[in-house]
């Protein structure tokens, strides 16, 4: 699952995240964030819940708003993408500089994340200090041919992303 974390702790806290769900697992709300990090506005309440908070699998930048993800099971893209996850980052509104506005890729091995998120589809944000953006990715799905569709509610478009045999340089 993807999680958009709380606001009000600064530009870089707490991280949004992507993680698997454990039955009966506690992920911190509202007493802790990203593992056993106490929410300072709760003044140490419920330390027993803070201690049992599960640390998520993958940190994403704070306030980037991960809205959707899709696991890649196709064969159109290079083999390195198979089994990994594409995650849409809708973008920020409450940071001193904009961030997000892209699709990232998280590699997987043996059903678990095996690396950090890396940029896959970018270009919606003109510059971090500029308040103007070209679009905001929302959803991502894989089509039967292995290409991806990415919805964009800022640009009011649906983008088809396919692989043509060469890597971008």
Predicted segments, located by residue:
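Beta-propeller domain segments
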Residues: 1-135, 161-169
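Blade-level signature of beta-propeller repeat domains, shared across WD40, Kelch, NHL, RCC1
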Residues: 141-169
């Amino acid at each position: 699952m993807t999680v958009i974390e709380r606001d009000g702790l600064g530009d870089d806290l707490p991280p949004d995240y992507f993680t698997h769900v454990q039955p009966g697992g506690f992920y911190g709300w509202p007493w802790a964030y990203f593992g056993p990090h106490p929410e300072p506005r709760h003044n140490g309440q419920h330390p027993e819940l803070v201690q049992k908070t599960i640390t998520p699998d993958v940190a994403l930048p704070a306030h980037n708003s991960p809205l959707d993800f899709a696991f890649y099971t196709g064969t159109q893209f290079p083999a390195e993408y198979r089994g990994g996850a594409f995650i849409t980052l809708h973008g920020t509104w409450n940071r001193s500089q904009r961030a997000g506005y892209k699709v990232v890729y998280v590699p997987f091995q043996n059903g678990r994340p095996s690396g950090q998120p890396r940029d896959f589809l970018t270009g919606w944000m003109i510059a971090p200090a500029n308040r103007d953006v070209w679009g905001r990715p929302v959803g991502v799905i894989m089509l039967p041919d292995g290409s991806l569709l990415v919805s964009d509610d800022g640009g009011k478009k649906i983008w088809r992303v396919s692989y043509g045999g060469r890597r971008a340089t």
